[in-house]
Amino acid sequence: YWVFQDNAYTSPYLPLFTGVSRIPEVYSIYDPQQYSDNSARWAIDFVDNLLYLNWQDGKKDLEAARKPLEDDFFKQNTEIEKQYLELQKKNPKKARELLNTYAQECADRIMHTYTQLRNTLITKYTNNKMR
């Protein structure tokens, strides 16, 4: 599965294989009444809202940050699938853990990328001015 948070256009897609037994922690944290730096939903929503300061230029920054990330996920998925099939034959528990670890690593990369993107958007587009 490819999972997104908030806005499908601005959200990165997180690869989650059938067989994961836990959701990455940053995707489990969300309280609409309380911002959290540890929440993927808040990180993505923050970027989504900042894009409205300068949509035409900001969406270029979004694409420059998100596309390489998702392209890498697509490439890695093939290798993860191969590793999973091999492990599943020998040790199903380790195979499941591989999927959990991969999902967590992808989620962590998304958080890092979107935190950096948030900082870029704040810096570049404060008061609707490109800096």
What is the predicted role of each segment?
Residues Y1-R131:
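C-terminus-biased signal that marks the final domain/tail of proteins
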